[in-house]
Design a protein with these regions (language model features):
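Binding-site signature for planar aromatic cofactors or substrates
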Residues: 1-214
Length: 214
């Protein structure tokens, strides 16, 4: 352990696996053995039913990024047990994840299914494909994605339900009134101090949501 100070508080920080194992112990045999090197039928079925995933990448220097991806269930296509495709739909053109993959192919995915507390974790190597028959095949409403992320699967396993059960994610227990959270236009106005009025920002955002989904 290493002694450090965080926000004026003296703390001990783990520096190795040995430090962590001294606190957590070893995983169970089931937890160790559940990691697969391919997408079996259960993983493929989970992906087919999932309308949402979180996509994790990092650049060449290790700066991490996490991006949400969502569409109708089945929007992620499984080509075989080792390969899946994620279409890149219209966004704001920051393309953080795509830029990261050009210098560091390592990628992590977390698939969710509404109403199911377990999640699916997939890790592997990603490539940004800009020309292939897949792009046309993954078009929606006549709109073709400009690229597809092809993932070579190295690891896949189901995550237990504890996190989603604790958060009660699929129930209304912690649901907030939308009016209790500032609009995106208001937040951007406060954060970057732009001259555009909040109402105009919100209107532009809603127009983008309506006209630029695909």
């Amino acid at each position: 352990m290493k002694l450090e100070t965080i926000c004026g508080v003296d703390v001990e920080v783990a520096q190795s696996e040995a430090d962590l194992r001294a606190i957590y112990g070893q995983p169970s045999e089931l937890a160790r053995r559940k990691s697969l090197t391919r997408l079996d039928r259960h993983c493929q079925d989970f992906i087919a039913k999932s309308p949402f995933l979180c996509l994790s990448t990092a650049n060449a220097t290790g700066d991490a990024d996490l991006s949400p991806r969502g569409d109708a269930p089945g929007f992620v296509r499984v080509l075989d047990e080792q390969t899946l495709l994620i279409p890149d739909r219209l966004g704001n053109n920051r393309i953080d994840s795509l830029l990261n993959l050009t210098t560091n192919p390592h990628i992590g995915l977390l698939f969710l299914i509404p109403g199911v507390d377990e999640t699916l974790r997939v890790n592997g190597l990603g490539q940004v494909v800009t020309a292939a028959p897949w792009l046309e095949e993954m078009a929606v409403n006549g709109k073709t994605p400009r690229s597809v992320i092809a993932v070579q699967v190295r690891e896949a396993f189901l995550q237990c339900a504890k996190a989603l059960k604790r958060s009660r994610l699929w129930s209304n227990d912690y649901r907030v009134d939308r009016q209790d959270v500032p609009s995106l236009g208001q937040i951007l106005f406060d954060q970057i101090g732009c001259a555009t009025p909040v109402a105009e920002l919100d209107a532009a955002i809603e127009t983008s949501y309506r006209d630029r989904m695909y």
